[in-house]
Amino acid sequence: MKRISVLFLTLCFAGLSAFAQKDNKALKKAQTLYDQEQFFAAGNAFLEVSKDKSLKDQKEEIQIKAAQAYLKGFQYKKALSVYEGMVAAGPKNVEVFFMYAEALRSLGQFDAAIAQYNKYNEVNPGNAQGPSRIKEIGEFKEGMNKPTRVKVTNFGRFNTRFHDYGANFYKKNGIVFVSKREEAAGKKPEAGTGEKFSDLFEAFLDKNNKWSSPTPLKGMINSPFNEGAASFTKNGTQAYFSVADKTGKIYLYVSKRASADWEAPEKISFFGDTVMLANPYLSNDGKTLYFSATNAPGGYGGIDIYSAKRKGNGWEDAINLGPIINTSNDESFPVVHESGDLMFASKGHTGYGGYDVFRSSMKDGSWSAPKNVGLPINSTADDIYYIANPSFSRGFLSSNREGTKGGFDVWEWEITPLEFNVLVTVKDDSTGKILPNATVKLYLLPDSSFRDGMTDEKGQIKFKLKSNTEYALLVNKDKYFGNTGSVSSKNEEFSKNFELTIGIAPIPPQTIVLEDILYDLNSANLRPESEKSLNILVDLMRKSPNLRIGIYSHTDSRATDRYNDSLSQARAQSVVNFLITNGIDSARMVPKGLGEQKPYTALVNGKMELLTEAFILKQPKDKQEALFQLNRRTELEVLGSDFEGNIKYKRVSGEEDSKGAGSLFEGRTGGDDK
């Protein structure tokens, strides 16, 4: 991993703890390089000084400084090499075991890191950091095995073998990012790295979804020195960024443009220019400026995030965001979403290694506890400059994770859209045979709008579903009773294809006896035990909304014809009334009392017999009542399947597509086009 210079990525301004130094010029030079944030050169210088025998009493401390310098410059492998040598020699400072473990973790060497954390726990019992880090590694490894909808890919078209980072939305269809590529301004290389100084570059997405080649921002915004990531006003006419001057000091600047060219930047001062500032980000309403600083008033240690309110043409005094956001470690790279949420990178909050991205919301004047945005946005490396479109479905981040072309690269992230489908297969309930040309209706609950279609030659039909939605299905076919099914995408976190088989029963040509439809003696009142069978009939009618039926009631022969006809008609009407009460259209039902006109045919003594009164009275006395009971029955006959009735539900044409990830530049209207 290459070193990225100065405050733009590390913001580690804190001076090193004072050495009990001898008058050693090489050591002083190494310290000066560190103070100038030339961390790569400082690490090399400290490492060389550690070989000086005259400083043998300070050797371990100087080696720690070398490793720290490499870490500040994101040179984890070099830092790791220093720690390995110290551990092999047996360090006096037990913190070396922890530092070594941290470097191993940042490089993804988890088992080795756990071994060093355990060693640290042995030599420093009761510490909180070691066990916490081991737990974090376990959570990271567990999280890596979990499925996710977030896809992170290297934005290769813009990345080079140099540092490319800090992408931000610009105008309607562009981005601006920082790069140290060959096209950057400035003829002199940066001390310590030999690389170009960083500049701000722009690129635009055209109507054909093609990106233009990155070019430096026009005008006077780029200097011969390092420019940091930029934030823009909504109309795109002001840019806020940080610049390192020739002395290595870093401050905030604003540049304005009235046309295509940017004007010379003007310094924005806070704290009387006594501290260095970086990573400015302007709120969507342009009224609040967020930035990073250290050694500033009200700090909590390490790097902190501050904000300042606009006041006329200037700014009020900056204030620290407080201990909910800032820790004793480093918090930096603030980004403010259109929603007002704050995204920032932290080494102090619980994470996976290096800088992790966190998100916090303003509620009742206070920031909520920061939430780690999770894998794979975060990694064991450093993950910073996280930006998102309005729907939080797409955006960019910068990272030096595995797969980078240079030290830091721009990465694009996207939440893949949820996609749900249901494949319905319709079969004959009795034979299992597939049924083409069956009508399947998919009802959206709870409003019951529906889409419908016919099964194909395989007896199947496919529907797209919305996310977090419940559906009911209704299947009908000529000469078959209908049936229902259900499918739900509620609480489904990932795309899914549902499969559902619904069987429907053929309508028999003869009438059907409705079992257990019972009445009070000599009455049309339905007995309570009839309700179960009646509810089954209601369900059948609901599942077959086009069905028309006849309800036929029969009596036995032990009364006058007139009495039996009247009683059976009333009983048939009672059944129809029950169905009407339960929402079945009366126009679909014909009640008819048949009295004793149609005796039942039953199997008696091995033969099918018509249960006339004469036949029953010839049977043994103990059998006669049961045979009379068979005649007292209620039957159903299907009269047709052509009922249309009143349209209660709205048919929806076409398919319901799942929501996509949204445009990268959705809702952007600020600034002119390219």
Where are these regions (language model features)?
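Short, conserved micro-motifs composed of acidic
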Residues: 24, 99, 106, 110-112, ...
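A short, amphipathic beta-strand motif
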Residues: 30, 420-429, 502
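Periplasmic OmpA-like peptidoglycan-binding domain that tethers envelope proteins to the cell wall
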Residues: 346, 351-353, 554-674
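A short, solvent-exposed beta-strand micro-motif common in secreted/extracellular proteins
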Residues: 469-480
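Periplasmic peptidoglycan-binding/anchoring modules of Gram-negative envelope and division proteins
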Residues: 519-553, 576, 580, 636-640, ...
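Short, ordered, surface-exposed loop/turn motifs in non-cytosolic proteins
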Residues: 302, 431-445
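Short, acidic Ser/Thr/Gly-rich low-complexity loop/linker segments typical of extracellular
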Residues: 444-461
